Amino acid sequence: MTIARILAAKGRDVVTTRPDLTLAEVAGVLVAKNIGAVVIADDQGGVIGILSERDIVRAVAKRGTTVFNEAVSMHMTTEVITTSEDEPVHVAMEKMTNGRFRHLPVICQERLVGLVSIGDVVKHRLAECEYEHKAMREYITTA
């Protein structure tokens, strides 16, 4: 199974924001949209960073609540690890597990086309396991 299959099921909508917004403004977006990360994009739609709940907590823990008045660009992760639509799901899962992050932007021809979370990946991996389990049971009972 590939990342494209996950995107086909969940949709391709991605919440993006500009790097000049304040941390408080973007935290408000995370709360309003009930999401754990937002992609920071340039004017052409290219990914220049990602900001997660963890990034916000880390900033507050290091420097206090004054960080909420600072630009997102000061706190976003700029070395963004990405995936492609044709990448196998297990490879994306390994990237997230090994990198200890939960959100993976999907890029096609240098453009953002989706975002998958570890929850999306686990959900689809479980569905795949259930399908395989059912197929094995049917094979055993009909043999």
Predicted regions and their residues:
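Tandem CBS (Bateman) regulatory domains
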Residues: 1-12, 52-81, 88-97, 118-143
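Short, charged helix-to-loop "capping" segments that act as catalytic/coupling loops
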Residues: 2-19, 41-46
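The conserved cystathionine-beta-synthase
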Residues: 16-34, 40-41, 82-100, 107
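Short, charge-rich amphipathic segments
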Residues: 21-33, 62-74, 110
